[in-house]
Every structure is written in C-alpha cells, then in structure tokens.
Amino acid sequence: MSRSRQPPLVTGISPNEGIPWTKVTIRGENLGTGPTDLIGLTICGHNCLLTAEWMSASKIVCRVGQAKNDKGDIIVTTKSGGRGTSTVSFKLLKPEKIGILDQSAVWVDEMNYYDMRTDRNKGIPPLSLRPANPLGIEIEKCKLPQKNLEVLFHGMSADFTSENFSAAWYLIENHSNTSFEQLKMAVTNLKRQANKKSEGSLAYVKGGLSTFFEAQDALSAIHQKLEADGTEKVEGSMTQKLENVLNRASNTADTLFQEVLGRKDKADSTRNALNVLQRFKFLFNLPLNIKRNIQKGDYDVVINDYEKAKSLFGKTEVQVFKKYYAEVEAGIEDLRELLLKKLLETPSTLHDQKRYIRYLSDLHAPGDPAWQCIGAQHKWTLKLMQDCKEGHMKSLKGNPGPHSPMLDLDNDARPSVLGHLSQTASLKRGSSFQSGRDDTWRYKTPHRVAFVEKLTKLVLSQLPNFWKLWISYVNGSLFSETAEKSGQIERSKNVRQRQNDFKKMIQEVMHSLVKLIRGALLPFSLREGDGRQYGGWEVQAELSGQWLAHVIQTIRLTYESLTALEIPNDMLQIIQDLILDLRIHCIMVTLQHTAEEIKRLAEKEDWIVDNEGLTSLPCQFEQSIVHSLQSLKGVVDCKPGEASVFQQPKTQEEVCQLCISIMQVFIYCLEQLSTKPDADIDTTHLSVDVSSPDLFGSIHEDFGLTSEQRLLIVLSNCCYLERHTFLNIAEHFEKHNFQGIEKITQVSMASLKELDQRLFENYIELKADPIVGSLETGIYAGYFDWKDCLPPAGVRNYLKEALVNIIAVHAEVFTISKELVPRVLARVIEAVSEELSRLMQCVSSFSRNGALQARLEICALRDTVAIYLTPESRSSFKQALEALPQLASGADKKLLEELLNKFKSSMHLQLTCFQAASPTVMKT
C-alpha cells in the first residue's frame, strides 16, 4: 500500500558532533505534518523521541541520548511517510571527566566516575586521587580538533588512569607547546612524586619502631607480675592487698578531720540554702507577681514568666518547688478563665480578639478558644440583626407617619447610593408629577428603607471582621509560634472539621439578612413559619419605585462589599436571588404607579389645541412612560453576576400585561373625556391657531366647547397617538430591553383603533343625520311634484341649506384639525349621496321639467363636493342619475349647463372651502 507522502529525508544536523544530551537541530524534507505525525526519531541508534520537538515539516529540535554507537545516522519515522533516510551522520563524543577538585560549571554526578562502595572503610590508594597535573609543569590545552586526535590514536585515551593510556596523546593535548627542557624537568618531578609515595609509609613505620618495642616490654612485665601474684596465698592477690591499704588510709583520714568536715558540711548547707533562696526567688515571688500583672493587664509579662517557670520547675520533684509551682498554675488557670471571658464578650474589636486568642494559645488553654470566639461572634451578629428589626418596629409604632428616621447624608458610607437616589428623584414627570411635592421629600426616608439601610450597614460592619477572624483561624496566624508548632497537626484537623460548620454560620447570616429584608419589602415571599420572626411590618402604603430602586442599589453595594472579602459565590447566591426579586417587584410597582398617574391625566386635560389639532395630553402620556422607564434603567440593567429580570416567561407576561394596561388606561381616559358631560368640563376658552389663512373664522376665548368639538379633539389625539406616540413608546420599551413589545403594540393599537372608530361613528351620526333627515323634507316642500313642476330656474333652497350645513361641519372640523376634514366630510357626503339616491329611486316617474330639475340638483351637489367623493358616494350619485330620464334635447343640456354655472357663480364664496387643496381622503 503506497503512502500519501514521501518518506522523511534528513539533510542536515547542527551541531554534527557532541556529548550525550547535546541539543541538536535536525533539518530535512517531509519531516511530518505535525507533532502527532512524528512517531520515531533515532540518533546513533538511540531513541530520542521523548525529547523531540516538532517545529515544522523541515525542522525538528531534540537532545542526543546515551547512545552505544560513536557515530550513526539520524532516522526520522512518521505516520504519513514511514521510516526515512539520512544523508548526514552524527558523532557522539565521550564526556570529559572532571576531577574531584576541578572547578565545573555544572553539577557532576560523581557516581559515574568513582565507586564509593569499594572505597568505603579503607585507605584511598594514591593513584585514585589522580593529581590534576602529574608532570608538575604548566598545562597548555591543545587546539587540535578532538576528532583528529581520535583518528590519530585509534582505540587509545589521554586519561592516564585508563588501561589504554597514550602518553603521546596526553602530551599533545596538554603540553603541545612545552619545550624539551621542561619535559625533562617534568620527568624528574614525576620520579620524585613516585619515590615520595613509596617512601612515605616506610618512613612512618621506622619513626615509631622504638615506641612499639617499649610498649611491648611493659605489657609483658605486667603480665608476668600478675601471674606471679596470683600463685601467692597470703591475703589474696596483689589487688586485694592494695584495696585494704586504701581503706585503712581513708578511715584514718576521716577520724582526724571529722570535726572539721562536720563544720564544713554545715556551712555548705547554710550557704546552699541561701543560694537556693536567692537563685529561686523568681519562683517564690511569681504567684504574687502574676496577680499584680493580671490586675495591670500585662498579660505578656505573665505569659513569659509562666513559660520560664514551666521550663525550670514543670517537672521538679522538690516539694517546696512543687508547692509554689502549684500556686503559679492556679493563678494561670484564673488568667485563662479571665481571658476566655474577655474573648467571648461582645462587642469586641478584631485586634482584641486576636490578642486574647494568642494569649490563650500561649497558655495552652483547653478546648478551642478561637472557635468559641467565632461562634460567639456569629450569635452576636444574628442578635444585632434581630434587634435592629425590633428597634425599627418599635420606632414605627411610636412615631408613625411623617416622623420617619432621617438619612444621615453627611456620614453615610455609601454616597453613591444617595447620589443615585437624588438623580432618580430629580426626574421631571411632567405637570402630573409635580403637584403636592416639595424639595424635602427625598430626605424623608420610609421606615422600611431606613431599616434596610441600617441592617446592611450593620452586616458590613460585623461580617468583614468575622470573615477575617476565620481566615486567621485557618492559616494559623491567630496562634503564637510555639503554639503553632506544638498544635499544628491538631489544629489542622480542627480546621477541616470546622469548615462545614463555618459555612453554615455564614449561610445563616446571609439567610437572616435576606429574610429580614424580604419581611420588610417582600412579605409575600416568606414562608408561613418565617412570617412572625422576620415579618410583621405594618404596611400603610406600598413603597414607590424610586425608593425600591434605592434599596436595590443599597443591596447591590452590600453584595459588592461582601464579594470583595472573597466569600464564595455560592454563599452569596441568596443575595442575588433577593436582588432579582426586588428588581422584578420594583418594575411591577413602578408600572402600577405609572398606570395610576396616567389615570389622573384626564383631570389635567386643558383642551388647549395647537396648530396640529392636539392637546398636551399625548405628550404628557409619553413623558410619563419615558420618565418611568428612565427611573427603571438602573433596575433593568444587569450588574456583573446578575440575571435578566425578563429571563422567566411568567415575569415577561406580567410586565407585558402591565404595559398593555397602562396603554389601555390612557385609551379609557380618552373615552371618558369624549363622553364627559359639558357641566363637568372647564372649557372657558379654546385656543387655536388663528394665523392660518384657511381658517373660516376666529374663535374667541369665551367660546364654549360642545360635545362634538370634544369628540373632534379626542379623535385628533387618537390619530396622533396611532401615528407617533405609540410607536415612540414601543421604541422606548425596546431601548430599555423590555420583552413582548410587538404584543403590547398590537393590543394597544387595536384598542386605540376601536375607540377611534367608535368616536368617529358617533360624530358622523351627530352631524350627518340632521343633514340627511332634512333632504326629503326640503325636496317636497310646497307640495313639490316631480311629475308636475315648472321649468327649473336654479338649484332649490333645500340643497343650498344642505351645503351650508356641510360647510358648517367643515368649519367645525377645520377649526380643530385640518387632517380630519377629508375623513369627516367624505363620510357625511356618503350619507347625503346615499339618501339622495334613495329618494330618486323612490320616484315613480319624472316629467321633463322634473327630470331636468333633479339632474341639476344632483350634478350641482356632486360637482361641489367632488374632492371629497369616495367610491361609495360616486356610486350613489351614479345610481341617482341613472334613476332619471335622459335629457330629451340639446336645449335641455344647454339649460342645465347654464343653471349649473349660475349656481356656482352665485355661491362661489360659500363653496370656496370645497375647492381648496386637500390631502388624500382618510380612512372612514
């Protein structure tokens, strides 16, 4: 099977010779496609794959190993190309041996040069020392290549301790430039060194020979004397006689000096007693000194004295010392109890706690005082948190309402929180948000907000020291050096056992903090069993969205401070869950309050119309929503580690429904405004743009609004809401990352269009019905009969009255909104044309004059309102004309044209409004 690539070919290696472990660079062709493709690399028969580093298809770097062959090829094997070949070779040099006393830049493995096992416990032969310069003359290293020397002296060595030593090689390598005279001197030195080595041991033996003989003679004489005395039977041997003599001499001496020795012993005893009192005054005074130093608080002095006494008298058997040492131990036990009591006192600083723990550690107090301190601090923190809640609840019962605790603005540790609150509070909410509010509102903190502020400050004042105390307990810095060394194993065991317990303590503090905040702000999220302990707040009113945002920022800063202590995230996750719930609650409350404020916008409607036929209501509505969303920006935005408030589908749906309800509340306000009785609306003036040249007439300030005018104003507002406001609000929702925007827009638009259509139909009914109703009466006024009538002299008055009424509608609509004119007039004309068609179709027959009169009036009306005709009205006019007989002669057509021109000329001024340029007819 042929391979996909050519076999590797090594064409170069640098360097091409060296000792084992020399780093070489191999170059060639097809050396592999990657590190995993390289499966073999041998140099001089030694596998170097472990040290190989594949650089590219033409380069590999490795180290030469301990090969057996002095010279060999470089073979590369790859998966893709198989076993390769080499055009170059590498020569492996033997490493130069370094003498015992020679300086070397690398660490020398002496076991490779000397066999220490064979040299142990015996003299070192002279040759094993291998002097660095056996000839005794200056060494000058040869500059000839080692390779040439090896070729010249094949199989030989320059090492003079080697079996294949070559003197010529040695001289060429070390003394190539040495003169012959110096070499002769070197031979003399070499002979002298050899003689010294052979004569040294002989001289040592000769010098001590007489001493050896004298020692031998003495030992022989002693041996002979002992053997001779051993045969005698008088008073035993010589040693027994010597013992008797010595005993008699001792007894005689005691008798002579008994009195003197007695006095000496008594003096020595007295002197020793005084020395003991002076020497051990430290121990005898120590119990009293311990009491005094404890009273002064010099615990370090007491501990040092105790350690000294313990080392001197801890294991004494002297009764006096044991008595006084027992008193010392009793005083130290009292000190242990005192220090433990001070350690467990609360409140206490971290410095004092560490100091007392170190004292107790030095005194080898039983148990684990450091852990007892941690437990006491934990209970104290929980008690402070509960007391904080009870204190605020008592304050709330004693000082309800306006007497709320004030925020300490000057001493607050978190100015950014108050800055955020001030920035949020300063948002202008339009006219509807300014009533009944003064500048002092931001300094009146609700009780529950003040409670959260104080609670978080309390936790941040206690927990850092609590955490640092645990860290010191873990790393052993609480204990002294001696205590750390003596109890290190036991303490490590305790730390492993205490880790889970401490984790539970931290979690208990976190749970208590979160539940207390939930009890104050989110009581519905507590379990039934926790409600009494953590809840119980008398909530008179729901917190505003701004205060909730302030609380969220406070808790966020608390979380950041706890994270800075390097507390594990799993212990702080419960705070993140609380922040998420508060963010969702803040959004809900803000949107609900926004809906309430928008509901009150109807009370602020002033009915002042601008040039576009709009009041300030749509703008106020948009501003209200925009300011609400701006106040929620910091709440909706996610801080590091926080989840999105819209991650849960349930939350998305609730927020979407609240947004829809806000839009529908405003739509309901518009409907209420359109149907409100005249007496309930203050419309003492109506302001319009009187500068428009198309205005039919000026409206004075004392003009009262009618129900039809209110309908028109609301319709104009509806049109603006549909084209601009609702779309702008959708963009603001999207900008603030709200979800379900399409649904909000669709539902809101549908409700708005429904209201618009209903109000439009009401207005058309109010305006079109009277005009339509007057047509039939006007046509048949004066017993007019289509079968028997005079030749037409012009358009009759009923049609002129209808046109005047239509002009009045035009004027009324134009006064409010120019854009509504085509839509309203088109529907009115549809109704009029439909009625006119019906009346014409009901006539059984027309006379020649009657047909001409009817055609004149229908054409006059149609031509007058031509710019407002719709397909429906054109169809009605067509049906009306089709119901008439055709004109009999050209004279009738001429008469019809003359009468039409006369009508248009006589009513030119009145019909001007129908001739003005008009936008495309709007929807009906």
From Swiss-Prot:
Location of N6-acetyllysine modifications: 454
Locations listed in the record: Midbody, Midbody ring
Domain of life: Eukaryota
Phosphoserine sites (modified residues): 431-432, 435
GO cellular component: exocyst; Flemming body
InterPro entries to which the protein is assigned, alphabetical: EXOC2/Sec5, EXOC2/Sec5_N_dom, Ig-like_fold, Ig_E-set, IPT_dom
Location of Phosphothreonine modifications: 440
Name used for this protein in its record: Exocyst complex component 2
Annotated source species: Rattus norvegicus (Rat)
